[in-house]
Amino acid sequence: MDQHEHHGELVKGFFEEQKQIFAASSQAMYAFLDDDCRVCNAKFATLLGYASADEWFNVNVQGSFPNAFVDPQSQHALVNAYQNAMEQMAGATIQVTWKKKSGGTVDTTVILVPVAYQGHVFALHFVS
């Protein structure tokens, strides 16, 4: 199993373990391991204009989640918060403007927290 397949299995396992939170949260949510290994709830997909979490997941981010989904003016803040979560195990609350599927944008507040699962650290995002 290569690293991409391994990360894919980790995301599936993480989502299964956290499924109740993803389904019941009143907030849009997504978890991020790397650009291609991510999962979201229906609320997050809908917020960005996608019909389902699967449709959002299937977007080819071409190696850059921020370029695909985040307004250029918000990319630095999101990447820095992610790096702090991974390196210093520090959560953050930041303002992020997302790109919508339709071409528009939506302004949000994101609470980002590091969460460990099977020896890997995910960034769990609550979006409102």
List each model region and its residues:
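PAS-associated C-terminal cap
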Residues: M1-E17, S128
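Sensory modules in modular signal-transduction proteins
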Residues: V11-D34, C40-A42
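Short loop/turn microsegments at loop-to-beta-strand junctions
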Residues: Q27-A28, D35, T93-I94, I111
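PAS/PAS-like sensory domain cap-loop motif
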Residues: F44-N60
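PAS-family sensory/regulatory domains
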Residues: E55-Q73
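Terminal output helix/cap of sensory domains in signal transduction proteins
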Residues: N67-T97
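PAS and PAS-like sensory/regulatory domains
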Residues: A92-I94, K101, V106-V110
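Short loop/turn elements at sensory-signaling interfaces that couple input to output
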Residues: V110-F126
